[in-house]
A protein has these predicted regions:
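Alpha/beta-hydrolase-fold serine-hydrolase catalytic core, especially in secreted/extracellular enzymes
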Residues: 39-132, 137-142, 156-159, 168, ...
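Bacterial N-terminal signal peptides
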Residues: 22-35
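Cap/lid segment of the alpha/beta-hydrolase catalytic domain
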Residues: 149-263, 303-313
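Alpha/beta-hydrolase fold nucleophile elbow
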Residues: 266-278
Length: 453
């Protein structure tokens, strides 16, 4: 995604260093998209990449130069984005710059303690693309810190009653210019598809609302069906010249919601949070890394292609979602090039910590379950440890990178939500609940950052 603009933010910097007190970070502006700061580097084919069992260093540029100043770090950020797009995500179109919203319906909920609006967004070529989002706000005056929460369920308030969708047909696996070749069979759509009553949805968010957070939620497949046929619907026919996998498309869609939310009086645009679970945690990782308007990223149970480092996921390494498993089952999430790392994962020139490093100096937390078999704690720990040098370089507290484990399997629980809210309170609102967000299940982790054989 091209840069939207620049903003200067003054942050405290360690006085013993030679760095300036003005830390320039990429952030939002309502101006038109600017060109990228540097041309994309020429990147080698997978077969020509070196074997690298250790986590690739975020502070070393492609030419081997060590990052020692902010100008170099900005260039390094662009390199990292280019690498992630080339080998994993694909390339997305620029922001359309024309997002608008129309209220479809509204009502009070929770006995007057909160308000609900169903909003239809329009954008893209001739504003022919759209999304329906549900906005829940606490009663009273805003602006409120706002959580954007992609959901597996239908957008609350939408009148849609076709229930579970049938499996999609097998698609042509040799379609040129797409990532369809990574998929050889149809996958059923994930569709928890009955309408969701706004009052019922508000009850599920009552804790968040009572703590002073607004919630924007929406059905994620509006941003691309979760199957190999995703290119035939949603945004993709409007942008035929892009090779993005659906994971990047989902993240791009979340950023269109940010386009709208940051213009609304209910939202404190300096306190926008993205939180999603499982594959929606993966999209949270991508969106937070590539959209600097998101003040805090909170992927939950995101597993492989999320918080879990590829080098520590998969057969013989722990968890289920290594690069082999992800590209075999979910190849349409990515560009086909990622599948070329099957059997040679140590050639990956990146890993999950790059998404966290791109988030710096903004706060980020991974919310996990101790018994989530999709991703073992060590894969998460390696990601967190490998990203922290960027936060140290930028002179901000290491507690801006957090992790929290609750006792459960692959799920998003009320305890997970409370951990994320406590972390957001601490990082964005100056409310310290006395919690530590740096604890891992000790017996399941290691400080060794080299992938096991």
């Amino acid at each position: 995604m091209p840069l939207r603009g620049l903003r200067f933010i003054i942050l405290p910097i360690h006085m013993k260093t030679h760095r300036a007190i003005a830390l320039i970070i990429l952030a939002s502006a309502t101006v038109a998209a600017l060109p990228v700061l540097a041309a994309s580097p020429t990147l080698p084919e997978v077969k020509d990449l070196p074997v690298r069992p250790e986590m690739p260093d975020v502070m070393t540029m492609l030419d081997g130069t060590r990052v020692t100043n902010l100008t170099q770090w900005q260039a390094r950020r662009e390199e990292m984005k280019a690498v992630l797009e080339h080998y994993e995500l694909g390339h997305a179109p620029p922001p359309p710059g024309n997002v608008s919203g129309t209220d479809v319906r509204s009502q009070t909920v929770l006995d007057g303690a909160a308000n609900f609006r169903l909003v239809h967004l329009k954008f893209g070529p001739e504003q022919k693309l759209g999304l329906d989002i549900a906005v829940f706000t606490p009663a009273g005056a805003g602006p409120f810190p706002t959580i954007i929460n992609p959901s597996f369920f239908m957008t609350p308030g939408v009148n849609f009653t076709n229930g579970m969708a049938a499996p999609t047909p097998v698609m042509n696996t040799n379609t040129p210019g797409t990532n369809a070749s990574a998929n050889v069979s149809a996958r059923p759509r994930l569709n928890f598809g009955m309408p969701v009553d706004p009052e019922r949805a508000a009850r599920s968010f009552s804790n968040q609302l009572s703590r002073g957070y607004a919630i924007v939620t929406y059905r994620y497949t509006q941003c691309g069906e979760d199957n190999p046929n995703f290119r035939t619907n949603s945004f993709y026919p409007a942008y035929p010249g892009y090779d993005w996998g659906v994971l990047y498309g989902w993240a791009w869609g979340l950023s269109r919601i940010v386009d709208y939310v940051e213009t609304q009086p209910f939202a404190d645009k300096s306190k926008l949070i993205a939180l999603g679970h499982s594959r929606l945690g993966k999209l949270t990782m991508v969106a937070t890394a590539f959209d600097d308007r998101i003040a805090l990223g909170a992927p939950a149970g995101s597993s492989g292609a999320g918080t879990g480092a590829y080098r520590f996921c998969g057969p013989g390494r722990g968890g289920k979602e290594g690069v082999e498993d992800m590209t075999r089952k979910f190849g349409y999430y990515f560009v086909p090039r990622l599948a070329e790392f099957t059997g040679q994962m140590e050639k990956l020139p990146f890993d999950a910590h790059w998404f966290v490093a791109l988030t710096a100096p903004r706060p980020w937390i991974s919310v996990e379950g101790t018994d989530d078999q999709n991703c073992v704690p060590n894969a998460v720990k390696q990601t967190v440890l490998a990203a922290k040098p960027v936060y140290a370089f930028l002179g901000v507290s290491p507690d801006r990178v957090g992790v929290n484990y609750e006792t459960h399997r692959h799920a998003l629980t009320p305890e997970d939500w409370n951990a994320a809210l406590d972390f957001a309170d601490q990082q964005l609102r100056g409310k310290d609940h006395g919690r530590k967000f740096d604890q891992f299940p000790a017996e399941q982790t290691s400080t060794n950052n080299v992938a096991p054989k």
